[in-house]
Amino acid sequence: MMPPPFMPPPGIPPPFPPMGLPPMSQRPPAIPPMPPGILPPMLPPMGAPPPLTQIPGMVPPMMPGMLMPAVPVTAATAPGADTASSAVAGTGPPRALWSEHVAPDGRIYYYNADDKQSVWEKPSVLKSKAELLLSQCPWKEYKSDTGKPYYYNNQSKESRWTRPKDLDDLEVLVKQEAAGKQQQQLPQTLQPQPPQPQPDPPPVPPGPTPVPTGLLEPEPGGSEDCDVLEATQPLEQGFLQQLEEGPSSSGQHQPQQEEEESKPEPERSGLSWSNREKAKQAFKELLRDKAVPSNASWEQAMKMVVTDPRYSALPKLSEKKQAFNAYKAQREKEEKEEARLRAKEAKQTLQHFLEQHERMTSTTRYRRAEQTFGELEVWAVVPERDRKEVYDDVLFFLAKKEKEQAKQLRRRNIQALKSILDGMSSVNFQTTWSQAQQYLMDNPSFAQDHQLQNMDKEDALICFEEHIRALEREEEEERERARLRERRQQRKNREAFQTFLDELHETGQLHSMSTWMELYPAVSTDVRFANMLGQPGSTPLDLFKFYVEELKARFHDEKKIIKDILKDRGFCVEVNTAFEDFAHVISFDKRAAALDAGNIKLTFNSLLEKAEAREREREKEEARRMRRREAAFRSMLRQAVPALELGTAWEEVRERFVCDSAFEQITLESERIRLFREFLQVLEQTECQHLHTKGRKHGRKGKKHHHKRSHSPSGSESEEEELPPPSLRPPKRRRRNPSESGSEPSSSLDSVESGGAALGGRGSPSSHLLGADHGLRKAKKPKKKTKKRRHKSNSPESETDPEEKAGKESDEKEQEQDKDRELQQAELPNRSPGFGIKKEKTGWDTSESELSEGELERRRRTLLQQLDDHQ
């Protein structure tokens, strides 16, 4: 069973372009599979025996008188053995190992009858010497995806597009060998061929060339075939002799063949052909050689070919006419193709002529072109219809060409104008278009360039605009660089002035307590201060303030350091401590080198204030202890048994109190005498007050005073109240006019009246004083808090010690009490004396219901003063 010859051999060469990579093994592309039920040509059906030519000892049947074609015989022999092949009539040809076949797509493949394999590549046993050398060459040809051939070297792994010289030399050898074979086979073309066409034999492998030496026996009764056989026997013998002589004798027979062809035709009249097809082909060649046209009649053709010996190739007239008609049909097709090619060539010639002619443009009319080129042969040879098509194509080509040329010219002009503008120093970012035009006309490069002068105005304006924008960008960049330089210089000036302030601080001229007015004379003489003047941003004064604020911000940290130094040194700041001693103690410590002088001074002031506060607190405590001692001494005098009298002398009673602790606590004798005298004065005042109280009681026994109810809004008292005694009443004063007393509200009188009644009828003056003092304290509490907060906000320290806070609070209380006393003393002379009571027939005048607490306090103090005066 034969393998399907239409299947491709394994392996397909990659169509990679040369990139330095070795390609895969080369193989032809796969053959498309055949439809089912269809076998490739020249192959038997599946299961059928192979052709007779492939069966050893079998010869295909031939017509009588036919010459058996040469059959290639190739046998695989052992190494060193010679391969011999000869075919003799009557002896069967040897079995062929390789046979050549044609695939459905026209490609040739080879089949091995022994191992039943088919390959695309020609076996080495069938190759000639040149083909073997070509197959052994390391360079192989491949094709890329685009179909372009490239070459790859299997040994050096190199790929290239150009064809190597080795391949060219080998192909020249192959062509020379093929030409030698054609010269060897040339005598065979002179002999008649068998009537049945046979496929061309495959290429002869290296070794002896097979020679056809046998003929088939003619059939009985075939006289014509016998004549042909007898005529071809001399030619066959000559051809065999030529093959036996080898390639060296082929060159000697070629001149003889040329001489035979150059002989007159009557000498070739004895030629005959082996089959009818060859004879018919010879008759057609005769008609072609005589250039018989396709529209010639049989009679015209006979006149042209009847004298040629090949006219008798077909013995029958019907066969001649049949061959003539076939020739006419074929010739007609050829003439049409020739006419089409001539017309195509004429159109191409006309198109090329019009495209290259200088008078042709894309705007030229067809009539104008016809008038210009109508007399030329290149124009007239093309038909009108084809000429217009060609003309339209030419116009399209010229329009495209002119457009491309215009683009190139525009690009060139723009580039030239840019170069000229770049080289003109007189053009800046403020130059106008009219000025630039004048500058361009004065420029020699622009004046000598005619194409540049014919440049489109819009393109020139666009080019100029781009140039101006580029100059503006450069100018803006230059300005930005200048601004950056200026800012950098200003920053350097500020840094230099900051360094100058650091120098002043290091020398001690600048500290946290420095002021600009004090430091200005030293600062204004420095050049770094002068460089700062006039520049935007922070001024020298701002930098000075910032510097001082930074020093002040370091106060608390430096204060802690100073306290640590004093603690380590065992030094304490007292009220009488001098700053020089304080600074002298601190200067011995290394930590004092980084301290600010102003902060040192502030710390000293703070510590000094604390010392003063402690001293004041100590004095206050001493005063409180003294007051307690004095109170104890007075209590001792008051509790003396028997009680002391007004006329008693201190020397008389001193011995009675010597052993008492209160007596011993008062160390000074003068203080004891003073306290004793004060006690006697109080005792005297008490006695006087007691006498006045008794007199008032006896004077009111027989009298009844009826008081009408008060008409004031606050009249919640009883209908009848006792008036104060005459000794406690204020002195009567002249009644004022309403105009004189308009500034004083009448409601105050009612409040004062109620206060006076309370003094006379409900209790002692001391109880009312205590109540007034209590109300006054309540009213003054918010003010004290406000003052405290204000005082805290003004203090240099945000955080103080508890002892310092207590001392400050006590100081503030004393200061507030002193201020109240001074205010009361200042208001006493300006106040209206007495109650200022307006009496009516019905009772006290209470026109106003409210008085301020301050007014009530002042009036209360006035009443107390008057009471003291009466006593």
Curated annotation (Swiss-Prot):
<feature type="domain" description="FF 5">
    <location>
        <begin position="554"/>
        <end position="610"/>
    </location>
</feature>
<comment type="subunit">
    <text>Interacts with the N-terminus of HD.</text>
</comment>
<feature type="compositionally biased region" description="Low complexity">
    <location>
        <begin position="739"/>
        <end position="756"/>
    </location>
</feature>
<feature type="cross-link" description="Glycyl lysine isopeptide (Lys-Gly) (interchain with G-Cter in SUMO2)">
    <location>
        <position position="838"/>
    </location>
</feature>
<feature type="domain" description="FF 6">
    <location>
        <begin position="625"/>
        <end position="682"/>
    </location>
</feature>
<keyword id="KW-1017">Isopeptide bond</keyword>
<feature type="compositionally biased region" description="Low complexity">
    <location>
        <begin position="245"/>
        <end position="255"/>
    </location>
</feature>
<feature type="compositionally biased region" description="Basic residues">
    <location>
        <begin position="691"/>
        <end position="711"/>
    </location>
</feature>
<feature type="domain" description="WW 1">
    <location>
        <begin position="92"/>
        <end position="125"/>
    </location>
</feature>
<feature type="cross-link" description="Glycyl lysine isopeptide (Lys-Gly) (interchain with G-Cter in SUMO2)">
    <location>
        <position position="175"/>
    </location>
</feature>
<comment type="function">
    <text>May be involved in pre-mRNA splicing.</text>
</comment>
<keyword id="KW-0507">mRNA processing</keyword>
<dbReference type="Pfam" id="PF01846">
    <property type="entry name" value="FF"/>
</dbReference>
<dbReference type="Pfam" id="PF00397">
    <property type="entry name" value="WW"/>
</dbReference>
<protein>
    <recommendedName>
        <fullName>Pre-mRNA-processing factor 40 homolog B</fullName>
    </recommendedName>
</protein>
<feature type="modified residue" description="Phosphoserine">
    <location>
        <position position="764"/>
    </location>
</feature>
<keyword id="KW-0539">Nucleus</keyword>
<comment type="similarity">
    <text>Belongs to the PRPF40 family.</text>
</comment>
<dbReference type="GO" id="GO:0005685">
    <property type="term" value="C:U1 snRNP"/>
</dbReference>
<dbReference type="InterPro" id="IPR036517">
    <property type="entry name" value="FF_domain_sf"/>
</dbReference>
<keyword id="KW-0597">Phosphoprotein</keyword>
<feature type="domain" description="WW 2">
    <location>
        <begin position="133"/>
        <end position="166"/>
    </location>
</feature>
<dbReference type="InterPro" id="IPR036020">
    <property type="entry name" value="WW_dom_sf"/>
</dbReference>
<keyword id="KW-0832">Ubl conjugation</keyword>
<feature type="region of interest" description="Disordered">
    <location>
        <begin position="690"/>
        <end position="871"/>
    </location>
</feature>
<keyword id="KW-0007">Acetylation</keyword>
<feature type="domain" description="FF 4">
    <location>
        <begin position="490"/>
        <end position="550"/>
    </location>
</feature>
<feature type="region of interest" description="Disordered">
    <location>
        <begin position="171"/>
        <end position="277"/>
    </location>
</feature>
<feature type="compositionally biased region" description="Basic and acidic residues">
    <location>
        <begin position="803"/>
        <end position="824"/>
    </location>
</feature>
<feature type="compositionally biased region" description="Low complexity">
    <location>
        <begin position="182"/>
        <end position="191"/>
    </location>
</feature>
<feature type="modified residue" description="Phosphoserine">
    <location>
        <position position="852"/>
    </location>
</feature>
<feature type="domain" description="FF 1">
    <location>
        <begin position="276"/>
        <end position="330"/>
    </location>
</feature>
<dbReference type="GO" id="GO:0003723">
    <property type="term" value="F:RNA binding"/>
</dbReference>
<feature type="modified residue" description="Phosphoserine">
    <location>
        <position position="832"/>
    </location>
</feature>
<feature type="compositionally biased region" description="Basic residues">
    <location>
        <begin position="777"/>
        <end position="793"/>
    </location>
</feature>
<feature type="domain" description="FF 2">
    <location>
        <begin position="340"/>
        <end position="397"/>
    </location>
</feature>
<feature type="compositionally biased region" description="Pro residues">
    <location>
        <begin position="192"/>
        <end position="211"/>
    </location>
</feature>
<dbReference type="InterPro" id="IPR002713">
    <property type="entry name" value="FF_domain"/>
</dbReference>
<keyword id="KW-0677">Repeat</keyword>
<dbReference type="GO" id="GO:0045292">
    <property type="term" value="P:mRNA cis splicing, via spliceosome"/>
</dbReference>
<keyword id="KW-0508">mRNA splicing</keyword>
<dbReference type="InterPro" id="IPR039726">
    <property type="entry name" value="Prp40-like"/>
</dbReference>
